[in-house]
């Protein structure tokens, strides 16, 4: 570490004549430091030299980590951002904001003191990527698995020393994560090929890891559960102190939450107007007494759409259904040139492994390495009953594919990989990510499917009301105005969800703070930019030029993106 800092100082002192050179030197030093201290992230982004290790988590390691972050912030603050080019200034803002967020988490959230997922997620992700990424050659895969397995017992022992309080909710999540890690570890031998001595050593490490994990699980449930309790999420003060670090300093919590509630009513009314004709085909005109009657009409209509036999999809044909849907969406987007044809990612469909722990029906994997020609795995959650029905109907599969593949997340990833900046690729703006996915679905409907029947539009708007409702409950839940049970009830009712759908959103808000609020702001911001862009261009407006402007400079914060797009 001392060598890295010596390099930083020498480079910066030697480049005083150029603020831009100083920033470039500092950012490169930070990236090297980041991958060294985050070896699982290095593996995730395709940096091969850290495959065999995990992040160091002892008290002294955390202190060194915090001190390094503080030094990077000091060095970065000494670079005059006004002397940077507009493009480099964006990277400066991204890096500075991310460093401040890391510093806040380490100083205020301090997850290693109460959240077992701090170490369990590191273990799971580190092994899962090595197990599933196809581009890792076998020698590196074996060496990486071997090194990481050896580290697990010590990591769990260190975690025991550092946890001083508990959150019952996170112990529950931790138990599920441990079960998933054990399942993953049991499958590792069939993923590896090496000499017998090495494989025997790995087998012994697997036995030791499973024993350590089961011991850790017992300790969580019997010992940690009796330590002082953390009142999650209230004790974390997410609704006020954390908000600017996760959302951005330009957004005010009160203003955001006020807009959320206003938007909820508007979207629900839109859904109702589309639902009523369908409802009246099988029902008498309802007698409206209160808002609940309006919601009941919508709920009945959504259930009616999902239960129609012609809309349902057999699990046995799910892969072909997804392929047909994606091909159809690609033809739609290309027929009007909505996105550049030569910037896209190859996508391979696969059933997710049983040990992949995700509440979502689909998930992208292996899209992080900055290689435009690499392939993305699109995991579909499998089900034991191969003759049964897939949980999503055909309309919902189209919506999901528009969001994640084309013209959604996969297209955004491809453009981000083409842009040269490593800082903005390493730390993409989460509000931009979420906003583009929602906009991608809206764009398909507005540009191509506007004359489709109301059922599609109802389900599209249901996706938006899910975002809005999740944003609302995060404001209430994080501030202690609503407990988890009441938040679940609210989101089920207001967003027309079943139990599993509501639980999936709650888990997101539990483990990935402000997921709903980020998506809501992203949805509002990108539509605001589109409206202003259309106004500026008038008759010269072209949707493909707008999309190109949004995508071509990487996944950057909206305050910077807006300047770039509207200056064109």
Explain the meaning of each model-derived region.
Residues 9-17:
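Hydrophobic h-region of N-terminal signal peptides that target proteins for export
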Residues 2-8:
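Sec-dependent signal peptide recognition
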